[in-house]
Amino acid sequence: MKVIKVENQVQGGKVAFEILKEKLANGAQTLGLATGSSPLEFYKEIVESNLDFSNLTSVNLDEYVGLDGDNPQSYRYFMQENLFNQKPFKESFLPRGVKDNAEAEVERYNQILADHPVDLQILGIGRNGHIGFNEPGTPFDSQTHLVELDQSTIEANARFFAKIEDVPTQAISMGIKNILDAKSIILFAYGESKAEAIAGTVSGPVTENLPASSLQNHPDVTIIADAEALSLLEK
């Protein structure tokens, strides 16, 4: 596991973009993508570049259950606004947040992931150490599944909604096994609120109580983080 300390998210995006270019030069075909504020500067680097993504495939980590793709709070909408509209891929797959047939969607998405092995997976990390929407207690051998979101996750995401009652309580997420199946992984972490999770991810015991600690079992993980997120690691 490699840890790269950066000044801020802008520098973090540039560092990640250099890693991406190296992977593409070595034949990467499929990118695993994440939402949230952490990868935004990385996506800006992609959009502003002259790289052609029209022969590449993307798969996203997760999606809320109960939000249509045209809902501004859906992850599909986020990806369209921040990346896909400006830099189209050959194919871009996201879980569909269908409420009535979630189990069928789980099966569909697991098949997509089997058909499109991820070369480089992008991750953020939750305060409780979740990756994707894999909350504490998620088995490390899990594949795509329906998730009941932790209250801490709902509260963290409430800032994007008019009121906390509007935040979805379920999501469809890649499992931890799906994430670990990627050839390479970049995890972004910014801010003091992520410090405890990062300390456990890098140097704590590998435990299902901290989903991101599973990354210690992966051969090619790069953590890009600022001083605040690394503050407990450096003491």
From Swiss-Prot:
Keywords: Carbohydrate metabolism, Hydrolase. GO terms for cellular component: cytoplasm. Pathway: Amino-sugar metabolism; N-acetylneuraminate degradation; D-fructose 6-phosphate from N-acetylneuraminate: step 5/5. It catalyses: alpha-D-glucosamine 6-phosphate + H2O = beta-D-fructose 6-phosphate + NH4(+). It comes from the Bacteria. Its EC number is 3.5.99.6. Pfam families: Glucosamine_iso. GO terms for molecular function: glucosamine-6-phosphate deaminase activity; identical protein binding. GO terms for biological process: carbohydrate metabolic process; glucosamine catabolic process; N-acetylglucosamine catabolic process; N-acetylneuraminate catabolic process. Catalyzes the reversible isomerization-deamination of glucosamine 6-phosphate (GlcN6P) to form fructose 6-phosphate (Fru6P) and ammonium ion. Belongs to the glucosamine/galactosamine-6-phosphate isomerase family. NagB subfamily. This is Glucosamine-6-phosphate deaminase. The gene is nagB.
